[in-house]
Amino acid sequence: MVIIVKPAENIRLDVLIATHSEEAGLLFKTVNGCRHMAYPDKSKVHIYLCDDNDRPEIAKLAHDMGIGYFGLSDNKLAKAGNLNHALSKTDSPLVVTFDADMIPRSNFLMETIPYFSLPEMILDHGEWKK
């Protein structure tokens, strides 16, 4: 089944990229992949680097790439703490999370977001059913 994002369904969403100690070069690739995801209204896609080491060079990378940055210097709760910190600062109805070494396909949003607007649909053993 292929479902396409309709204009009325292109709601705001936040893309959170969790990082702990990954190098800027790796993060550049991940952010670049996220920036190139297709979506009908790209102004509704907000990408953030969530850095639980609060590194100045990663904040600069985020700035240079035109995305948001959340630094967290006193994280005691690992990735969950990092993402919860970011979630406390965002308000989009949908959130996508990626690890620092995940590069999404350009069609990721176009193929996943429509499922959130299907009424009474459930995922049952890998199949969408009413």
Residues of each region from the PLM?
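Internal catalytic domains of large membrane-associated glycosyltransferases
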Residues: 1-130
